A protein has these predicted regions:
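A short beta-loop-alpha structural element at the N-terminal edge
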Residues: 11-15
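Short boundary motifs at domain starts and secondary-structure transition points
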Residues: 1, 89-91
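Residues at structural and domain junctions
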Residues: 7-8, 34-37, 97, 101
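Conserved HGGG/HGGXW glycine-rich cap/lid loop of the alpha/beta-hydrolase fold
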Residues: 91-109
Length: 109
């Protein structure tokens, strides 16, 4: 049985994707909050507004992309399941292999 091919890649969202996100954030319409400061009746509208504002004005995707791309990213297909991994060689005379994984599909970082 052969090993699956490791395909190197860099994270690079198209600018059109980021432009689309900026447009959607700018067009966000918020429902009335109904004084839900304690989150007792669901999501807090003030928090959602602040979060949306942060994503629209302050979050720098390209800086995050550069930070993520400081690592060596690879993809592979394992029995039809796409896998994203980072391979970082250990240092020192006897490095120990370590596998870190997450349980939510398609998430990273």
């Amino acid at each position: 049985m052969s090993s699956p091919a490791l395909i190197p890649f860099e994270i690079a969202l198209p600018q059109a994707t980021l432009d689309d996100l900026a447009t959607r954030l700018a067009r966000t319409r918020f429902a009335p909050d109904l004084a839900n400061d304690d989150w007792e009746y669901g999501f807090n509208g003030g928090y959602l507004r602040a979060l949306t504002d942060y994503w629209a004005r302050d979050f720098d995707w390209r800086a995050t992309e550069r930070a993520m791309n400081a690592w060596s990213h690879y993809r592979l297909d394992w029995h039809g399941q796409p896998i994203h991994l980072i391979h970082q060689r250990g240092k020192g005379p006897a490095p120990m292999p370590l596998l870190l994984h997450h349980g939510w599909p398609w998430t990273f970082w």
